[in-house]
Amino acid sequence: MKTKTDFFKMKQENEPIVMLTAYDFPSAKLAEAAGVDMILVGDSLGMVVLGYDSTIPVTVEDMIHHTKAVRRGAPNTFIVTDMPFMSYHLSMEEALRNAQRIMQESGANAVKVEGADDVVNVIRAFTKAGVPVVAHLGLTPQSVGVLGGYKVQGKDAESARKLIEDAKLCEEAGAIALVLECVPKQIAAEITKQLTIPTIGIGAGDEVDGQVLVYHDVLGYGVDRVPKFVKKYANIQETISHALANYIADVKLRQFPEATHMFTMKEEEWIALYGGKRT
C-alpha cells in the first residue's frame, strides 16, 4: 500500500497520482486490480449510488458503511473518505468524534474535508490528533448552495488570490494532499508549484500532481450526462441495458434457463420419491 511518503515522492519525481472514487466491494476490487494509487470514497455516493439530488443528505454512517465495503475490496490501496456535510462544523469535539469513527470503524487511511477559513482549524486539530487530512478547495459540493451552483471557481483575480492563500493555509495546517475541483488550469498550476504537498485535480487542468474522477463517470455507468472535465473510457450503461433486455426476452420466451443451467436428479431417485410410481 502506498503511503503519504510515497505520494510526496511521486510529486517530487513528477509521477502523476491516479485517484478514483469507489463506493462498494466490486468497484474497489477492480480499481485496486487496475493499479490506482488512491481510492476516494466520496460523499458523491449520495448522488451516484443513493439517488439524492446532492451530497447534503449523506451521513457519517453512510460513509462508514461504504468505506468498509471498499476496504474489503481494496485491502492494499490507500483510501480517503469524505467527511460528509456538517460532520465537522458544529463543534470541534463532534468533528473529532466523527473523524475518529470513520478512521476506526471503516478502515480509511485519511479523511477529506472541504473549504478553508474555519476548516483550517479542523485540519490542524485532526492532524494533531493523528488523523491524516486531505483538503478540498475550488468547487466544494457541500457548499454548492452558497457558491451559487456547480460553477468554476477562481476565475477572477480576487477569488484566485484567495484560492492560492487558502491552499497555503491548508498545507500549513497539516493537510497531506489537496484536491482542486473546477478551477482554471493556471491557478491549479500555480498552487501546485507553491505547495510541497501533492495536488489532485478534478477539472483543474493538466499541471497538477494527480487526477481524480468519479468511477461511474469514467465507465459511463448510471449517468446520462457528465461534466466537461470528464473523459468517458467506456459505456457500461449501454452494455448493461442490452444485457438486461436480453435476459427479460429470454425469460419471457422461455429460452432461459437452458439445460446447461439446470440441476437434475438421477432417474431412480426421482422414481423413489413417489414410492416407485412415476407422476
UniProtKB/Swiss-Prot annotation:
GO terms for cellular component: cytoplasm. GO terms for biological process: pantothenate biosynthetic process. It catalyses: 3-methyl-2-oxobutanoate + (6R)-5,10-methylene-5,6,7,8-tetrahydrofolate + H2O = 2-dehydropantoate + (6S)-5,6,7,8-tetrahydrofolate. Its main location: cytoplasm. It comes from the Bacteria. The gene is panB. It is an enzyme of class 2 (transferase). The active site is at residue 181. Its EC number is 2.1.2.11. GO terms for molecular function: 3-methyl-2-oxobutanoate hydroxymethyltransferase activity; magnesium ion binding. The lineage of its organism: Bacteria, Bacillati, Bacillota, Bacilli, Bacillales. Homodecamer; pentamer of dimers. Mg(2+) binds at residues 43, 82, 114. Its cofactor is Mg(2+). 3-methyl-2-oxobutanoate binds at residues 43-44, 82, 112. Binds 1 Mg(2+) ion per subunit. Pfam families: Pantoate_transf. It is found in: Cytoplasm. InterPro entries: Pantoate_hydroxy_MeTrfase, Pyrv/PenolPyrv_kinase-like_dom, Pyrv_kinase-like_dom_sf. Pathway: Cofactor biosynthesis; (R)-pantothenate biosynthesis; (R)-pantoate from 3-methyl-2-oxobutanoate: step 1/2. This is 3-methyl-2-oxobutanoate hydroxymethyltransferase. Keywords: Cytoplasm, Magnesium, Metal-binding, Pantothenate biosynthesis, Transferase. Transmembrane segments: none annotated. Signal peptide: none annotated. Catalyzes the reversible reaction in which hydroxymethyl group from 5,10-methylenetetrahydrofolate is transferred onto alpha-ketoisovalerate to form ketopantoate. SUPFAM superfamilies: Phosphoenolpyruvate/pyruvate domain.
